[in-house]
Swiss-Prot record:
Oligomeric and partner information: Heterohexadecamer of 8 large chains and 8 small chains; disulfide-linked. The disulfide link is formed within the large subunit homodimers.
GO cellular component, one term: chloroplast
N-acetylproline modified-residue sites: 3
Lineage, broadest ranks: Eukaryota, Viridiplantae, Streptophyta, Embryophyta, Tracheophyta
Processing and modification events after translation: The disulfide bond which can form in the large chain dimeric partners within the hexadecamer appears to be associated with oxidative stress and protein turnover.
Reaction(s) this enzyme catalyzes, per UniProt: 2 (2R)-3-phosphoglycerate + 2 H(+) = D-ribulose 1,5-bisphosphate + CO2 + H2O; D-ribulose 1,5-bisphosphate + O2 = 2-phosphoglycolate + (2R)-3-phosphoglycerate + 2 H(+)
Name this polypeptide is given: Ribulose bisphosphate carboxylase large chain
């Protein structure tokens, strides 16, 4: 280590302000297997050199502050400081660069996403020397990964619980999202489940409002689940949203769901918070409940290309905190999501080992070792004509969720569910026979519609519906 970057208590305390780069920019540093690595997109203020801006990010997200303090001499900053070890330009952006920062593992509490984010995406994002700052990716070392429980159950255990294999799972968000009474809500759930869906879902903003208190909703939905199971012979579920104003109330709702014997509950992990989410995930594993995660508020954090945090980081954090499903965009529907980037973080959710691949936005190789995987949920503006593309893009280990694409069917909820189930089964069969879903998708759907009047009606209603806007999230 060069004399410039080494911090020695023996030289005595010298008050004053010095450039961050003298201590925190260390281009010769060799990263350790135990370091947490971060890739930041940095937009400095005019006149701030890249080395100084990158070093400032490393400093302000680890041990540094704006001036020298005498207590620096009471510890070893070389052991604990973050280091900006590499800087690279951003193609097509003269004012931006990627700063790579390494953090010693001792800076973070074991098993706490909350603590990790408090440092890495804390006050540094308001630093005046930066015009904008975005966390593009994190490398979580194996040593830190092993301190997390992760998803309550994971993909294989969920399939075993549901006894459903070889195809994506089908879901539906009950609409209108607000305003239904508990009994009418339960009726809508029943109609969808008996028609062929595997799951129905509370909308993310359904908690416990005056028009429908949570306990009433839970009871009527449980009744709908059991009735649909008896009629179809299949295991069914409804994502009962346990999100609440306090952790205690959230846990009370999860306990009641377990007492009803339902298979799955739901949480809004960003608005609810990582501490609450991790607590709920631990409860779900201990009590046999699956946990569906909604990402409400994510676009506030991840949609701007130059500031905030990319969703792949939020996806990694969710896998650590715990969840069996998480919404991940659709590529083809009404919500944001470019194909290669979406598939990049979908792999980060599902797979054990993911190689670095900058073409898909993956900055670091990630080894999850034995942490269970998470099912990505495709939801938002999708309908039967999208089924071939969704099946081809997301594969079997996914949940395809049609809200308006089920309840908007001209004949009602159950026929809407039938249409989606028939379309899915047709696509899976065609794929298994070796047909090209991307090229022959429409033909496959039309052929299935000839013997399914429910699917034929759905095809007619949504034949002209498209959401063709350019994606914001591009490389």
């Amino acid at each position: 280590m060069s004399p410039q970057t080494e911090t020695k208590a023996s030289v005595g305390f010298k008050a004053g302000v010095k450039d961050y780069k003298l201590t925190y920019h260390t281009p010769d540093y060799e990263t350790k297997d135990t370091d947490i690595l971060a890739a930041f997109r940095v937009t400095p203020q005019p006149g701030v050199p890249a080395e100084e801006a990158g070093a400032a990010v490393a400093a302000e997200s680890s041990t540094g502050t704006w001036t020298t303090v005498w207590t620096d001499g009471l510890t070893s900053l070389d052991r604990y400081k973050g280091r900006c070890y590499h800087i690279e330009p951003v193609a097509g952006e003269e004012s931006q660069f990627i700063a790579y920062v390494a953090y010693p593992l001792d800076l973070f509490e074991e098993g706490s996403v909350t603590n990790m984010f408090t440092s890495i995406v804390g006050n540094v994002f308001g630093f005046k020397a930066l015009r904008a700052l975005r966390l593009e990716d994190l490398r979580i070392p194996t040593a830190y990964t092993k301190t997390f429980q992760g998803p309550p159950h994971g993909i294989q255990v969920e399939r075993d619980k549901l006894n459903k294999y070889g195809r994506p799972l089908l879901g539906c968000t009950i609409k209108p999202k607000l305003g239904l009474s508990a009994k009418n809500y339960g009726r809508a759930v029943y109609e969808c489940l008996r028609g062929g869906l595997d799951f129905t879902k509370d909308d993310e903003n359904v908690n416990s409002q005056p028009f429908m208190r949570w306990r009433d909703r839970f009871l009527f939905c449980a009744e709908a689940i059991y009735k649909a199971q008896a009629e179809t012979g299949e295991i069914k579920g409804h994502y009962l949203n346990a999100t609440a104003g306090t952790c205690e109330e959230m846990m009370k709702r999860a306990v009641f769901a377990r007492e009803l014997g339902v298979p799955i509950v739901m949480h809004d992990y960003l608005t609810g918070g990582f501490t609450a989410n991790t607590s709920l995930a631990h409860y779900c594993r201990d009590n046999g409940l699956l946990l569906h995660i909604h990402r409400a508020m994510h676009a506030v954090i991840d949609r701007q290309k130059n500031h905030g945090m990319h969703f792949r980081v939020l996806a990694k954090a969710l896998r650590m905190s715990g969840g069996d499903h998480i919404h991940a965009g659709t590529v083809v529907g009404k919500l944001e999501g470019e194909r290669e980037i979406t598939l990049g973080f979908v792999d980060l959710l599902r797979d054990d080992y993911i190689e670095k691949d900058r073409s898909r936005g993956i900055y670091f190789t990630q080894d999850w070792v034995s942490l269970p995987g998470v099912l990505p949920v495709a939801s938002g503006g999708i309908h039967v004509w999208h089924m071939p593309a969704l099946t081809e893009i997301f594969g079997d280990d996914s949940v395809l969720q049609f809200g308006g694409g089920t309840l908007g069917h001209p004949w009602g909820n159950a026929p809407g569910a039938v249409a989606n189930r028939v379309a899915l089964e047709a696509c899976v069969q065609a794929r298994n026979e070796g047909r090209d879903l991307a090229r022959e998708g429409n033909e496959i759907i039309r052929a299935a519609a000839k013997w399914s009047p429910e699917l034929a009606a759905a095809c007619e209603v949504w034949k002209e519906i498209k959401f063709e806007f350019p994606a914001m999230d591009t490389l």
